[in-house]
């Protein structure tokens, strides 16, 4: 933990008990300074108390002393939320009115984030052809994928399984198979054949967030 920005020496590792105390102190100090209520995309007292609750939840691991009552007290200060009936509603583009989002980071071109950067990083370059008849999508990076086995760890009826994209992709224009640049089908596999030189379609992709063809640089 470094609090003096004029310090020139390399910092040493701080014991986890001290890190815990530092985070607790910081959160408790800022809570009175933060706005109350629910504000989309802004850090509020609810957000800080949620983080404080998570900190206390793991207090015994970090410090050796359980803080269950403090965790409960922090949870009881987080008010005004409820679960949505539709699991995917909180991950939709227009989710500002979601009753369960405590803290959101807006990802769209209006906020200067070029849409959902994380989701774009995971799609194959030609995934745009499955999204839009004209192939309009801000960009696809084919950069990251899920660990093997994650997709199958969810029961087939578990809605959370839909958060991962797997299998053959089809054109939004005519229903034909989307192909990769080498002419082979864009068929996402759960397994990864070679971690140092993986096939471009290896690994399940992130499919949790609603995509938009209208976001742009």
Task: Tell where the protein language model's regions lie, with residue ranges.
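Active-site-proximal structural scaffolding
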Residues: 16, 41, 45-46, 71, ...
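Short, solvent-exposed loop/turn segments that connect beta-strands within catalytic domains
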Residues: 63-64, 113
